[in-house]
A protein has these predicted regions:
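Charge-rich (especially acidic), low-complexity segments
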Residues: 151-153
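Short small-residue beta-strand/loop micro-motif enriched in glycine and branched aliphatics
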Residues: 71-75, 84
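Alpha-helical support elements that line or immediately flank enzyme active sites
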Residues: 86-98
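Glycine-rich phosphate/pyrophosphate-binding loops
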Residues: 96-113
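Short, surface-exposed beta-strand-loop junctions and turns on beta-sheet-rich folds
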Residues: 80-82
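N-terminal intrinsically disordered, cationic/polar leader segments
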Residues: 2, 6-15, 19-60, 67-72, ...
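Solvent-exposed interaction patches of small proteins and small membrane subunits
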Residues: 51-58, 74-78, 100-105
Length: 153
């Protein structure tokens, strides 16, 4: 049986994955990514801290996470329209998942999606750093949930 979701993508991310795979024009792909970024809600200024800044990203990019009902919710912002769109892709794809579900998502999806071939090396590196930061938040929240469960026992 063929696995149509080898990267363990969330339903939202799988939907975007399928949409982007069909785009073979670099300009159209960038337009679609930028359009995604315009849909992100305004990022709370109080969250623009060094701790929430994505390191190794050419653009000034922030990502924050909160745990609510055992699910992780992300918010973010970048001063680059393209990076804002990439951020929106990840936020849309990761938010509302459990920390465990987030940790199962394989970053290699970006290659098969067709996006990695269109990004400059520095943008691709920034995307990886953003993904890693979101994974780290999920890891921290998984530990938090585990310790909460241990305290209840």
């Amino acid at each position: 049986m063929e696995n149509n979701n080898p990267y363990n993508l969330s339903p939202n991310l799988l939907k975007r994955f399928e949409q982007f795979k069909k785009i073979d024009d670099k300009t159209k792909m960038f337009e679609r990514v930028i359009a995604l970024g315009k849909r992100l809600p305004v990022f709370d200024v109080s969250l623009k801290t060094e701790e929430n800044q994505v390191k190794g990203c050419v653009s000034l990019t922030y990502i924050a996470a909160k745990l609510e009902d055992a699910k992780v919710y992300y918010t973010g912002e970048s001063n680059s329209h393209l990076v804002q769109g990439l951020l929106a892709l990840l936020i849309e794809g990761f938010s509302g998942l459990s920390p465990s579900e987030i940790l199962l998502i394989d970053i290699k999806f970006i290659e098969d999606m067709g996006l990695s071939q269109t990004l400059t090396a520095s943008r691709a590196n920034g995307f990886v750093n953003t993904y890693n930061m979101m994974q780290n938040y999920a890891r921290e929240m998984l530990l938090e949930l585990s310790s909460d469960e241990a305290l209840k026992s």
